[in-house]
Amino acid sequence: MSRLAGLFVQLRDAGRAALIPFMTAGDPSLTATVPLMHALVAAGADAIELGMPFSDPMADGPSIQRASERALARGVKLRMVLEWVREFRTTNSHTPVILMGYLNPVEAMGITSFAEAAATAGVDGVILVDLTPEEGRGEAVVLRQRGIDPIFLLAPTSGPERVATVRSMGSGFVYYVSLRGITGAAQADWAEVLERVQHLHRQLGLPVAIGFGIRDAATVARVATGADAVVVGSALVDQLAACATDQEAIAAAIRFVEPLAQAVRSTERRGA
């Protein structure tokens, strides 16, 4: 059983959602990435989404765009991101790591080379925001052949055909975008989102993670009543961006994530 599958089985038995914080590789510094990953786990993260910096992150709001720009200005490349995952794995063999980014850098490396390097490094899942399931069948097969889950996005506007395609192509979990817009946007109608996710559960047969617009423990607790996982991105990236040193960033990450982790652990998921 894969790390991601094992995590969701474990948390289903525990009756709670997973907390998955997002951070951009190489931000706020090159030396901070691996220590921050360990800090997130220590603070209560169940899995980590690690952003692969890209020059045109069209689905990301200003916070993550700026983080990508800072990381790229420091010279971050895709192979460096994979090396950081490999380094993380030398002392953590249990926490799932999901890479999130865009297709262009992966295509530049070559999907087969990328999948092989990612599998060797210890990556568990890959989300390519601009790769639709209809266009990503080949990439999904290559990833799955190497034990990596291809994770696709669904949105409030996704129709039955897209849902069916994701059901047949995706694995690991499905990332449900709670807002029509970019990451970091203000507020969703959470009752509507959770109703939609409940409907998707019946259709997909895969865990559903909810992301976009989740910034605090109260919202995490609300979303955790109906999601299999809660993703927090821009709010954490903002905290890290304000730090002048690696130690400040580590302390800020722990301070920010601990109450979010407490929120998922104290919230019973309906239907768990």
UniProtKB/Swiss-Prot annotation:
One Pfam family here: Trp_syntA
Reactions catalysed according to its record: (1S,2R)-1-C-(indol-3-yl)glycerol 3-phosphate + L-serine = D-glyceraldehyde 3-phosphate + L-tryptophan + H2O
Lineage top rank: taxon: Bacteria
GO cellular component, one term: cytosol
Pathway listed: Amino-acid biosynthesis; L-tryptophan biosynthesis; L-tryptophan from chorismate: step 5/5
Catalytic-site annotation from UniProt: 49 (proton acceptor), 60 (proton acceptor)
Organism expressing this protein natively: Acidithiobacillus ferrooxidans (strain ATCC 23270 / DSM 14882 / CIP 104768 / NCIMB 8455) (Ferrobacillus ferrooxidans (strain ATCC 23270))
Keywords: Amino-acid biosynthesis, Aromatic amino acid biosynthesis, Lyase, Tryptophan biosynthesis
Family: Belongs to the TrpA family.
Physiological role: The alpha subunit is responsible for the aldol cleavage of indoleglycerol phosphate to indole and glyceraldehyde 3-phosphate.
The gene coding this protein: trpA
Protein name as catalogued: Tryptophan synthase alpha chain
Coiled-coil region: none
A molecular function GO annotation: tryptophan synthase activity
Assembly information from the UniProt record: Tetramer of two alpha and two beta chains.
Transmembrane segments: none
Name of the top EC class for this enzyme: lyase
Entry-linked InterPro entries: Aldolase_TIM (IPR013785), RibuloseP-bd_barrel (IPR011060), Trp_synthase_alpha_AS (IPR018204), Trp_synthase_suA (IPR002028)
EC number: 4.2.1.20
